[in-house]
């Protein structure tokens, strides 16, 4: 899904990384709620002239039932889903490529507390030096990277710098370009 970006020249292109969060219980620190455990997706956009390619993906388990808690991982298209809070980061071409490389080569395994969608998006940001905040939150007696933690960290980021492009009003994620179709 990431090969699409090479179809647009990088000279004079604009590069954007977005984070979208579906909170488990919107506006709270609860790690389980109406939206189950919640979800965090990452969106990558490259624009040159009038051509834009956007891919929005999420990191998921392949298992079902209780096997979903710890299984092999998969990357799925996350375009066209509702989200509660989102953040936009304008990055360099070099940072963008590092994020693409990370997303295109995801960790082989998913674990609901040790390496989940929140940890994946945070890791992608770290790979490209994108200031996506650390989504670590309390889980029972321990800690883990969670969608609720990401939402809280984004709100904290916005409180510290009101000029950041963080949308607390939610909305619908635009559709992805899918398997490398330029529109």
What are these regions (language model features)?
Residues 2-117, 126-183:
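Non-catalytic ligand/cofactor/substrate-binding and regulatory segments of enzyme domains
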Residues 121:
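Conserved catalytic core of nucleotide polymerization and phosphodiester-bond processing enzymes
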């Amino acid at each position: 899904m990431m090969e699409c970006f090479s179809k647009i020249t990088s000279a004079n292109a604009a590069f954007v990384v977005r984070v979208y969060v579906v909170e488990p219980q919107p506006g709270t620190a609860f790690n389980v709620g109406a939206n189950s455990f919640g979800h965090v997706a990452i969106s990558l956009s490259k624009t040159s002239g009038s051509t834009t390619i956007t891919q929005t993906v999420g990191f998921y388990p392949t298992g079902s039932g209780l096997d979903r808690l710890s299984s092999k991982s998969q990357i799925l298209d996350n375009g066209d889903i509702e989200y509660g809070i989102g953040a936009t980061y304008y990055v360099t071409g070099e940072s963008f490529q590092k994020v693409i490389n990370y997303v295109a080569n995801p960790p082989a395994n998913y674990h609901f507390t040790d390496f989940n969608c929140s940890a994946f998006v945070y890791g992608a940001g770290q790979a490209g030096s994108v200031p996506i905040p650390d989504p670590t939150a309390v889980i029972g007696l321990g800690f883990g990277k969670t969608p609720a933690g990401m939402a809280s960290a984004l709100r904290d980021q916005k409180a510290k710098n009101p000029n950041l492009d963080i949308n607390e009003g939610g909305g619908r994620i635009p559709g992805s370009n899918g398997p490398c179709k330029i529109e």
